[in-house]
Structure formats: C-alpha cells, structure tokens
Amino acid sequence: MAAAPEPHETEKKPFKLLGILDVENTPCARESILYGSLGSIVTGLGHFLVTSRIRRSCDVGVGGFILVTLGCWFHCRYNFAKQRIQERIAREGIKNKILYESTHLDPERKMKTNNSS
C-alpha cells in the first residue's frame, strides 16, 4: 500500500488557465497573462473615457488583452529561446575546453607554440 500523505503536506495542484495552459510551470505564461490583463483594463477604460460606448469599449478591451498577451508571450519566448541557445553554446564551449585542455588538440596550446617560434 502507498503511504498516505500527512495532513500538513498538502499536494499542490497546478493552476491551469482554461484547462489548457499551466500558468505556474510554463515559462512566460504568468507575465503574459498579467500584462494582458493590465493592457485590457487600460485599453478598455481608455476607449470608454474617450467615446462613452460601453459595448465597443469591452470589445476594445478584449482586443487589447489578446494583443498585449500575444505580444508579451512572443517577446518573452523569443528571449527565453535565445538565452537557452547561448547557454547551450557556453556549455559546449566549457565541455570542449575541459576535454581538450593540455592535449595536442588544445587550440590555445597551438597558438602559443606558433607565437613563440
């Protein structure tokens, strides 16, 4: 039998937006949703203050939410992917440095011997 969890150890369920997007574990999701919500309020309220049309202001607010959320999402994911590529390149460089250090394949060693000649 599996041991029952103790009362003070509650199992934490992830928060899923619309049952699809796991906001806690997906990179950039939380920030995108928060900025989209703020963009929705600003655009909807701003449009209402200018035109005093309620229905159109709600539509503008929804559009603002979609545009700001997608804009933040793509910007953040692009930066996240760029950072992962840079980390991978650095990791491979460090691995090669460790692997080839003090061997006849070491590029720094070849440069030093060519300069001293």
Swiss-Prot record:
Side of membrane Mitochondrial matrix, spans: 51-59
Compartments (UniProt record): Mitochondrion inner membrane
N-acetylalanine carried by residues: 2
Cellular component terms per the entry's GO annotation: mitochondrial inner membrane; mitochondrion
Keyword terms: Acetylation, Membrane, Mitochondrion, Mitochondrion inner membrane, Transmembrane, Transmembrane helix
Membrane topology, as annotated: Multi-pass membrane protein
PANTHER family reported for this sequence: CYTOCHROME C OXIDASE ASSEMBLY PROTEIN COX20, MITOCHONDRIAL, CYTOCHROME C OXIDASE PROTEIN 20
Name of this protein: Cytochrome c oxidase assembly protein COX20, mitochondrial
Lineage: Eukaryota, Metazoa, Chordata, Craniata, Vertebrata
